[in-house]
Amino acid sequence: MVQKSQMNSLKSYRESIFISKAELARKAGLSVGTIDRIEKGKRCRLETKKKIILALDLEPYEIGKIFENDV
């Protein structure tokens, strides 16, 4: 099942800080395809979420903006 809120949240947050999919993928050590799938609402592993959180340098209170009670 596609989680539309997650799809919109990661993409919106990424765009709000003016970072491309390619740049986020590079910083997180992931492929652009992985970022694209997550932005489209596909589930991802906890390790992948951790990489994105670290790459975006999120504070603990900001994590819910992207992964909503999922981490």
Specify the residue positions occupied by each region the protein language model found.
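A short, Lys/Arg-rich alpha-helix, primarily the initiator
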Residues: M1-I17
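Residues that mark the N-terminal boundary/hinge immediately upstream of a DNA-recognition element
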Residues: S9, S20, R45-T48
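Alpha-helical residues within the helix-turn-helix
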Residues: E15, R26, L54
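Short alpha-helical DNA-recognition segment
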Residues: F18-D36
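Short, basic-rich loop-to-helix N-cap that marks the start of a DNA-contacting helix
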Residues: G41-L54
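Short C-terminal boundary/hinge segments that cap the last helix of small helical domains
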Residues: D57-V71
